[in-house]
Amino acid sequence: MKIIKKENSPQYARDNIRSFLLVAESTVGAKHITTTLVEMDPGGIQKPHQHEIEQCYMILEGSGVMEIDGEKAVVGAGDTIFIPSDSIHSLHNESHTTLKYISAGSPVFGMKNERELWPLNWQS
């Protein structure tokens, strides 16, 4: 059994966003899924980007504005958002509280993609 502790996972911080790499090829040898816990401070913005993989965001706390391929929606705790592969997506925390969510992607990003997504501030 593999149990991943947030405080022991690789971390990446950028622009009011902290990401914790939980399940991945590099952390547990995952072959089909990557999961990340993301904490976004008020005013934080995940800039528009896209991946070849499918993703979903499961909002744990807070709220924000999600945009996928030009369509915007307010999302909050309890919501799960599906992001099709190659969709341009972003998330903006317009609230006054921290937005926390789990990002799950499949198939797995792979080591090369992990390093591209988790560049300079990589910590473990």
Please tell me what each predicted stretch does.
Residues 36-51:
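Conserved short histidine dyad/triad with adjacent acidic residue
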Residues 47-48, 66-67, 83, 89-95:
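Short beta-strand His + acidic residue motifs that chelate non-heme Fe in jelly-roll/DSBH
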Residues 71-85:
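Short acidic-glycine-tyrosine-enriched beta hairpin
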Residues 1-32, 116-124:
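A short, N-terminal "cap"/entry segment at the start of jelly-roll beta-barrel domains
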Residues 38, 82, 97-113:
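A short hydrophobic beta-strand segment most commonly corresponding to one strand
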Residues 54-55, 59-64:
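Glycine- and acidic-residue-biased ligand/ion/polar-headgroup-sensing regions
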Residues 52, 71, 87-88, 97, ...:
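A generic "binding-loop/recognition-motif" signal
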